[in-house]
Swiss-Prot record:
Alphabetical GO biological process terms: adenosine to inosine editing; chemotaxis; determination of adult lifespan; mRNA processing; positive regulation of chemotaxis; RNA processing
GO molecular function: double-stranded RNA adenosine deaminase activity; double-stranded RNA binding; metal ion binding; tRNA-specific adenosine deaminase activity
Protein name: Double-stranded RNA-specific adenosine deaminase adr-2
Subunit comment: Interacts with A-to-I RNA editing regulator adr-1. Interacts with adbp-1; the interaction facilitates adr-2 nuclear localization.
Primary residence: nucleus
Length: 495
């Protein structure tokens, strides 16, 4: 049994021990958070009061001479008492569950911490503050996303000095290999900065649609060959901790060694059911990944977030499909809070590819690197890097939150009868492609049906050529092998 499977079994076992009289919404909140009731209650308690909860225990002598316990905590002057239990830990769990019931019922009143926007706050600090303020605002309408913010990312739109958050996501895990599907409905990479970009895509799709119906109200205008951003518009990315890969691993390498020179710039990838990243230049990783191989137990490989951000600074954030209609769009700045080092981050997302010359209309974006705090503390890392079993996403176009189970990349909910239902995320390949087809229909753009997702991407020939050139260049510079997913992931038909 793997470590992750063992953790899941332990979590399920703990849920089975929950008190029967605890409301379902409390049990569901604990389950979705991936945390034990004591940890979750303590975090919410701190959010509400600014203090750590103090648990007191009282003995209850039984007629047979045995000892049982009751745990009590005070929340905003209210005494919260758990059920009588034979062990102190069980009593504390019971008290925490009762406390969660109180907290969640009052979440809309207490949940949003006071975020101070001071006049001297820097632009990048504003990104951080607005990100957390937005997240806690969303918690008011969906308490189940509490505790998801260990790794959080957001994208901001800046128009002539006015700043607006347009996408926000949390998460630091990905799809398990035994849960893969070939119909484009499952999210593969649920790391926060990756989902924030996909939320940005939803916004960009909505703006392209808006241009087709009311051009003056869209962020786009007509360019020479495609839509381009209007003057004064830029996009900015915030991440609360350094992206996995080069931006993070470089800190651990010894300066001046061959490892430092050779490995600190090389491509790295995430492996399913694993933590951290692996160098992508080894010969055993040259063979393409296969669908049946992953199904049979091979560990799926996904490029690190540092490498994906590097790609975005070369090919744009819009991806292949939107490139049918718009010119490349780049982040103007990337800001990181914990574990940030401006030199490391700059190397990760820009310097490694600075000498690459992509074909027009692409370029290597000299993105501005922002720092939201001075100290790079290890203590913050342990909290920020903790994996969660769920991820949330929000974007301005859709306007509501969505919770995704990272192990299968799907949205899990219950119908009116209480039965479990599973649906694709709005950020998945299939739903994004269907948005593209909607745009083609409204703009009367010819599409040869039936068409696969792979064919739709390949139709953006300039993007495909630039991507191929970039991947070839990376290998020629001995920076490693770009790991591609099996073709089956992109061969599904779009309706």
């Amino acid at each position: 049994m793997s470590v992750e499977e063992g953790m899941e079994v332990e979590l399920k076992s703990e849920k089975m021990d929950l008190d029967d009289n605890i409301p379902d919404f409390v049990k569901e909140t604990v389950e979705r958070s991936g945390k034990n009731p004591m940890s979750l209650f303590s975090e919410l308690y701190v959010h509400m009061t600014g203090n750590t909860p103090v648990f007191d225990f009282y003995n209850r002598n039984q007629p047979n001479g045995s000892m049982k316990f009751i745990c009590v905590v005070i929340l905003n002057g209210e005494r919260i008492e758990g059920n009588v239990k034979s062990k102190k830990k069980e009593a504390k769990v019971s008290c925490s569950l009762k406390g969660l019931e109180v907290v969640l019922k009052h979440v809309s009143e207490y949940v949003v911490p006071a975020v101070k926007f001071e006049e001297k706050t820097t632009f990048f600090e504003m990104l951080r503050e607005h990100t957390y303020a937005k997240f806690y605002e969303l918690c008011k309408n969906n308490a189940l996303i509490y505790g998801f913010e260990k790794v959080i990312a957001s994208v901001f739109l800046k128009i002539n000095g006015n700043l607006q958050i347009i996408a926000l996501s949390t998460g630091n895990k990905g799809l398990r290999g035994d849960k893969i599907v070939n119909d484009g409905t499952a999210l593969i990479d649920c790391h926060a900065e990756i989902l924030a970009r996909r939320g940005l895509l939803r916004f960009l799709y909505s703006e392209v649609l808006k241009f087709s119906t009311e051009p003056p109200n869209s962020i786009f205008t007509k360019g020479k060959n495609a839509l381009v951003l209007k003057p004064g518009i830029s996009f900015h990315l915030f991440i609360n901790t350094a992206p996995c890969g080069v931006a993070r691993i470089d800190k651990k390498l010894k300066p001046g060694t061959s490892d430092d020179l050779q490995n600190s710039s090389r491509l790295r990838f995430k492996i399913d059911k694993g933590m951290g990243t692996v160098l992508g230049g080894a010969s055993e990783f040259e063979a393409p990944q296969t669908f049946d191989g992953i199904m049979m137990g091979e560990r799926m490989r996904t490029m690190s977030c540092s490498d994906k951000l590097l790609r975005a600074n070369v090919l744009g954030v819009q991806g292949a499909i939107l490139s049918h209609f718009i010119d490349p769009i780049y982040y103007s700045s990337i800001a990181v809070a914990e574990l940030n080092n401006a030199d490391r981050l700059r190397k990760a997302v820009y310097s490694r590819a600075a000498t690459f010359k992509p074909p027009a209309p692409f370029h290597v974006q000299d993105v501005e690197i922002g720092e939201c705090q001075v100290e790079d503390t290890e203590q913050s890392t342990s909290a920020a890097a903790r994996s969660t079993i769920s991820s949330m996403n929000w974007n301005l176009a859709d306007g509501n939150t969505e919770v995704v189970r990272t192990s299968d990349g799907m949205v899990h909910d219950k119908d009116m009868s209480g039965a479990d239902i599973t649906t694709p995320s709005r950020l998945c390949k299939k739903n994004m492609a269907e948005l593209m087809i909607t745009i083609c229909t409204l703009t009367k753009t010819s599409v040869d049906y039936p068409i696969s997702y792979e064919e739709l991407k390949a139709g953006s020939q300039e993007y495909a050529a630039a991507k191929k050139s970039f991947i070839t260049w990376l290998r020629q510079k001995d920076l490693g092998i770009w790991q591609r997913k099996p073709r089956e992931f992109q061969m599904f038909t779009i309706n």
